[in-house]
Amino acid sequence: MIPVTSFAGQSVAVFGLGGSGLASCHALRAGGAEVIACDDNLDRMVEAAQANFITADLRNLPWMNFAALVLTPGVPLTHPTPHWSVLKAREAGVEVIGDVELFCRERRLHAPNAPFVAITGTNGKSTTTALIAHLMRQAGYDTQMGGNIGTAILSLEPPRAGRVHVIEMSSYQIDLTPSLDPSVGILLNVTEDHIDRHGTIEHYAAVKERLVAGVQDGGTAIIGVDDGFGRDAADRLERAGKRVVRISVKQPLASGITADRETIVQADGGASHEVAKLDGIGSLRGLHNAQNAAAAAAAALALGVGPDVLQNGLRSFPGLAHRMEQVGRQGTTLFVNDSKGTNADATAKALSSFGEIFWIAGGKPKTGGIDSLAEYFPRIRKAYLIGEAAQEFAATLEGRVPYEISVTLDNAVPAAARDAASSGLPEPVVLLSPACASFDQFRNFEIRGTKFRDLVTALDGVKPVA
């Protein structure tokens, strides 16, 4: 745990008592603050009370007594409308911050030079975060990984010299971290997502850019320049005097890091050299994973990792569950769990990685549908549509891709397995990459992916992927 000493002797309101919120309560109390905990969920209030925290309805308390409101990232800060706790704090002139802001303040107080890598992007940030942490561990560093990827940041060990914190950050977390100052900041990409929480794509992109704009003096901003938002951000930061490393999987760069499906190449002033090989690494299959690997390599190099350690680390990376996860084979059919493909851009990366696809898609639809995936339709032998988006997706596929309305995963998996097995293709792929959120049928994408994995492993003759 990281004790938060910056509010010692002061009263702090914490709203949202899930994993990160409760961790904030413990960290603040350990640092000497008085914590008043609140949540709209009464069960979480009971849990906090059982942990001996003061709980109260913050609507009934005088806000001038609070030094800060620590807000969980899941609570609306601006859109579609600010949560009532945010309005109360603003009326009283109380700052509204999140757990990563508490971490940043503690790092500046106690270990300002401790390496801190922060990663964001619409897609790929979890894989990139896990890969960087893996590379740093392979290089012998004491590595702490958390944030949006799982472990609450304040539940990690405190910053100190020689200890690296590798932290995934969502746009919600960045919004709550006004003094974000990583030593290495990574912006992978920006495509339309979470517009319900940010209002416009421009505001969403501006929030993402703040992560790299905040890189501390002497640090490195690593920016994917394969979209216009990234290109503009890189140019702005360079003009502001930041050290910028551009990464691309679409074009060779005169200065920066370029990757394709086989190699990572670093260029400087026109001269280039190979940094690492990617061919044959199953956990990093696909051009989207080449981008993740390029960003991770750039971060590792910025932190002093040598080329041999980098190459060995890439080859030994096990990958992440629900992200292009190869869950089994039945004869020649490969089953791939990409449940984390919650929007069309993420699913495009999965579809581009295989040739003969029996595609399971659908769920709670997002803005834009799957029209942008048309270039990949020739790769799809048949689609199996589930959830709320089934009819919408069927209308898009009509006349272009054979499909059936499967409604549920329970129906889709055996149907896709049957059709793949009878197709006569040399390596058919049954791919779950929904291009949708999961909330119509599952609590989250992890539960959806686990359900897919369970259904696959229950099929006759399915074996683990060697």
Curated annotation (Swiss-Prot):
One of its GO terms (cellular component) is cytoplasm. It comes from Rhodopseudomonas palustris (strain HaA2). The gene is murD. One of its GO terms (molecular function) is ATP binding. Pfam families: Mur_ligase_C, Mur_ligase_M. ATP binds at residues 121-127. Its EC number is 6.3.2.9. Gene3D superfamilies: Mur ligase, C-terminal domain (3.90.190.20), Mur-like, catalytic domain (3.40.1190.10), NAD(P)-binding Rossmann-like Domain (3.40.50.720). This is UDP-N-acetylmuramoylalanine--D-glutamate ligase. It is found in: Cytoplasm.
